């Protein structure tokens, strides 16, 4: 069963600063779903969240972020994933809320045979703006990463994407991809 975590903005002009530290030890398997929501669909607020995901040797980590802030929230989210040898990490980020949402994702593959999958879906309407920045950092040889972001825009909504794949000189046989689709 997945572990579910809920963060709420309950009042006008409220701020939240959630931090998730997830350490999956050797050969562990875990799924975490983190929800970000507002009690009122018009309440202004500010959210700045951080999560640190660590997949130990042979571990399997699945992380889902469901961001559904109200239409007047400014949201910042920083995600860091470290993948050790023969481990895998999959993160899925769903963005439908907030007036402005900035999402930064760093995935570091530090062990041979590590794999990281970075997936995101953003559905933007009215004048929403979703800004995504990513770095897939291949430090060890024989690692793999795959990024797939899909965006749906309506009205005057905007999405921004900046992604980088870095391969260290000794990280031979790296397999890395990025694809962003907009509709």
Question: What name fits each language-model region?
Answer:
Residues 1-183:
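Conserved beta-strand/loop scaffold segments within soluble protein domains that form the structured core
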